[in-house]
Amino acid sequence: MSKKRIIFVLLYCDGFFCLSRNFKLQRIGDFRWLQRNYNFNYSATFIDELIILDISRKSRDINKFATLLYNLSENIFVPITAGGGIRSFEDAKVLFENGADKVCLNTSLIQCPHVSEKISSVYGQQSLVASIDFKHDHGDFKFFIDNGLIEVQYNIQELISFLDPLPFCEILLQSVDRDGTGTGFDLTLANTFRDQLSKPIILLGGAGHSDHLVEGLLHQSTDAVATAHLLNFVGDGLKLSREQAQRHSEVSLARWPLLSSTSFSTTKH
């Protein structure tokens, strides 16, 4: 039985971490706030991976984002995927050089597929995650890029045909409708994408508590579940969720030894 994963997502916007609901943002605090109020690297011992997305609505500063990524990666010992605003190979290179193990592409995946090909040629296909944002639409689906602002003019089969030849290792399926609602994952597309693309599926959008994470892990077509709900899961939330999932014999999670709690470093060493 292959190991499934629990992933936490940090949403970064214009210098602050945020909560998101249907892609509308609520500012929570900056890096120092996260350090002061949550022992995040303790919480990170109960996840399998971390995703950090720059969802800034104004102009993005890739170097500032890379510095944040570097500081986080100093004391977190799980693989890190970084994404948001990657428009070129050079953008991705900066993130890899500052702690990213993988990069996540959304807008450039659709608008500039040559970027994914260049990244893959240097860092390998296993370094790329395809991010797909979707909404329900009268029994069908709509797909979006650029923080949900631009609709992709593909139906589901056209999108799958477009993605099929691209070099990426897994798919992050994010429900805009469920984002931040705490009502559970939208599982409707997992089977279709998994069956037709034969890529691991990460679900994001809707997890409000540990039962939702377990439900997603139990789904036959999902390989990982992710949550960006900072207030619900940081602290003991991720620990309790992992323990609950491990009580299900159908869910195979890696068992990590508990790492000692250390404080964040806010500067490079």
Swiss-Prot record:
Its EC number is 4.3.2.10. One of its GO terms (molecular function) is imidazoleglycerol-phosphate synthase activity. The keyword RNA-binding does not apply. It is an enzyme of class 4 (lyase). Coiled coil: none annotated. Heterodimer of HisH and HisF. This is Putative imidazole glycerol phosphate synthase subunit hisF2. It comes from Parasynechococcus marenigrum (strain WH8102). The lineage of its organism: Bacteria, Bacillati, Cyanobacteriota, Cyanophyceae, Synechococcales. The gene is hisF2.
